[in-house]
């Protein structure tokens, strides 16, 4: 199975461009350099909202979020990952807020980079926080439309990188999304932006607490995300997904 990418989609130097990414991909070592701090952000001021299904974890307004980022910096954690809880009134069937340059994610990125320019910022690319149905893609005729979703994901990735995101992390599991995102980034001169692909994302009940945290799980329907996330019994398929994403230009992959 060939998992060797090709230039220009694959640029191994991207992983070496900044200190945080060099630390993240250092081999045969286990330290704070291998950690990513996930942070949940919400609207408001002075908000620290405990997530009931994740004991010890809270959602933070941007002002409070900065304190958590400061803690990460002091602990030498190289990167944080941002996940938004979008207010219900701002969601719609297309998840159009996902590519609004003034959305909660973009404002968070700008605030963090202003105070802590050296920490890496990883941003989730998927529509589930922004759609009123909670799916990762556009629902058309009761099906997830893969290719129309890719058009939205491209725009979502661009506004995040424009705001200062260092690593785009597509978690949507649409076919072809890594290649499309790599192309749109390169075409807009973001050659050094990393892509961390959720290469093999399983349709797992363990995502329940995460969906509670971002408020996206209540209207998924009886099949949930089975038509695009993977069957947990399929390990060979996982290797195929990893190979596809590397060939499309992913710099890092995770399961």
Stretches found by the model and what they are:
Residues 2-7, 18, 27-36, 42-255:
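Alpha/beta enzyme core
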Residues 13, 20-21:
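Acidic, Ser/Thr/Pro-rich intrinsically disordered transcriptional activation regions
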């Amino acid at each position: 199975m060939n998992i060797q990418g090709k230039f220009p989609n694959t640029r191994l130097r991207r992983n070496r461009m900044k200190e945080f990414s060099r630390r993240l991909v250092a081999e045969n070592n286990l330290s704070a350099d291998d950690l990513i701090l996930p942070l949940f952000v919400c609207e408001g001021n002075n908000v620290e909202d405990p997530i009931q299904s994740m004991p010890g974890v809270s959602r933070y307004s941007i002002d409070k979020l900065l304190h958590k980022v400061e803690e990460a910096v002091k602990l030498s954690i190289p990167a944080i990952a941002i996940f938004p809880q979008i207010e219900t009134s701002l969601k719609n069937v297309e998840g159009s807020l996902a590519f609004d340059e003034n959305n909660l994610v973009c404002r968070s990125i700008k605030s963090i980079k202003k105070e802590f320019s050296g920490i890496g910022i990883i941003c989730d690319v998927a529509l589930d926080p922004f759609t009123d149905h909670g799916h990762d893609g556009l629902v058309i005729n009761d099906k997830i439309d893969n290719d129309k979703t890719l058009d939205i994901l491209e725009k979502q990735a661009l506004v995040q990188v424009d705001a200062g995101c260092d690593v785009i992390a597509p978690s949507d599991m649409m076919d072809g999304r890594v290649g499309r995102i790599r192309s749109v980034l390169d075409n807009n001169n973001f050659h050094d932006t990393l892509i961390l692909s959720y290469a093999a994302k399983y349709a797992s009940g363990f995502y329940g607490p995460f969906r509670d945290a971002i408020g996206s799980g209540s209207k998924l329907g009886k099949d949930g995300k089975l038509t695009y996330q993977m069957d947990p019994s399929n390990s060979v398929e996982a290797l195929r997904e990893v190979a596809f994403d590397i060939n499309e230009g992913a710099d890092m992959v995770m399961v």
